[in-house]
Amino acid sequence: MSVDVKSAQSSKSDSLQVEPRPGERDKALNLVLGQIERNFGKGSIMRLGDASRMRVETFPTGALTLDLALGGGYPKGRVVEVYGPESSGKTTLTLHAIAEVQRRGGVAAFVDAEHALDPVYAASLGVDIENLLVSQPDTGEMALEIVDQLVRSAAVDIVVVDSVAALTPRSEIEGEMGDLAVGSQARLMSQAMRKITGNIGKSGCTVIFLNQLRLKIGVTYGNPETTTGGNALKFYASVRLDIRRIQTLKRGTEEYGIRAKVKVAKNKVAPPFRIAEFDILFGRGISTLGCLLDLAEETGVVIRKGAWYSYEGDNIGQGRDNTITWLEQNSEAQEQIEVLVRQKLTEGSEVTANSMRPLAAAARTAAKKPAVSLASEAA
């Protein structure tokens, strides 16, 4: 009778390998988790289901259409980049974000690297300029160090940097005019993002970078536009917003505002590539009633026939401007319309301004998120 030596050896080795019991595996896992927390601090490792801070909460942008496109608003504890051509509404968008944070009891800071902040305009948008922290740094290193220290304090809820293009490295400022400084700003941004991103997530502070557009030289095919400061910000940003001016609003020959279109070029916390449109009125900022009227018309709450708008069978205004004026004068009807619009969106209505994408999921997500004030969260 022949015996297979190899099979006998393999069966013997298999019998020697004793798998740990489920209880022993759990003990080993708890032991290593405890050791990691002792070495690196509490919260350094956790189960995703147990981590309440992993839940991404949001705060409003100031434009209802943009809130829906973002899945609820700006995410807390993330990096946001807003870019676009000149006079497209970038600073206005961030000033509204600051006003929303302050309205909820939060602390806001504005790093004015361009030295162009208009306090009168900011106040007209609802910003509490008495309590707004403002810094006008001399160099890019100084600006980003200030941002890092504000974020580390965990006492600030939003920091706006205006803008990345104005963050000039110290070597460039101290050098002669015409000296080459290839890649110095990109290196500065790359180092800064590596340093502050982790602290942003831990503190819950939202950092919004404004950025300008440049043209790539020698690009024949494709989009020649690019943003300043290299690629680091593109990678570290959870949300990137591309804002454009698509129309100038006029009454006769008088220009009183612009129509802005925002494309969500990147979004790590909600579906990307949605589009939102809203009016920006000179001296007054984003028209919240204009956003409400647009969504009310899209969802069928307000009916438009020709130039006339009607609500519950009654004509409320001829033309868009007159209808917005009617909404301003009838706050009770305005609140009713807003409630109906939100209900329609939750039920699954589609909005063409957002690329015909159903926004029910975004509205449901926004409705489920707890309305906790920023002050109580900091406490």
Curated annotation (Swiss-Prot):
Record's function text: Can catalyze the hydrolysis of ATP in the presence of single-stranded DNA, the ATP-dependent uptake of single-stranded DNA by duplex DNA, and the ATP-dependent hybridization of homologous single-stranded DNAs. It interacts with LexA causing its activation and leading to its autocatalytic cleavage.
CDD domains according to UniProt: RecA
GO molecular function ontology, one term from the record: ATP-dependent DNA damage sensor activity
Biased composition (Polar residues): 7-16
GO biological process, one term: SOS response
Any one annotated GO CC term: cytosol
Keywords attached to this entry: ATP-binding, Cytoplasm, DNA damage, DNA recombination, DNA repair, DNA-binding, Nucleotide-binding, SOS response
Organism: Prochlorococcus marinus (strain MIT 9313)
Subcellular localization: Cytoplasm
Name of this protein: Protein RecA
Chain positions recorded as ATP binding sites: G84, P85, E86, S87, S88, G89, K90, T91
The family this protein is said to belong to: Belongs to the RecA family.
Stretch list, region Disordered: 1-23
Matches recorded under HAMAP family: RecA
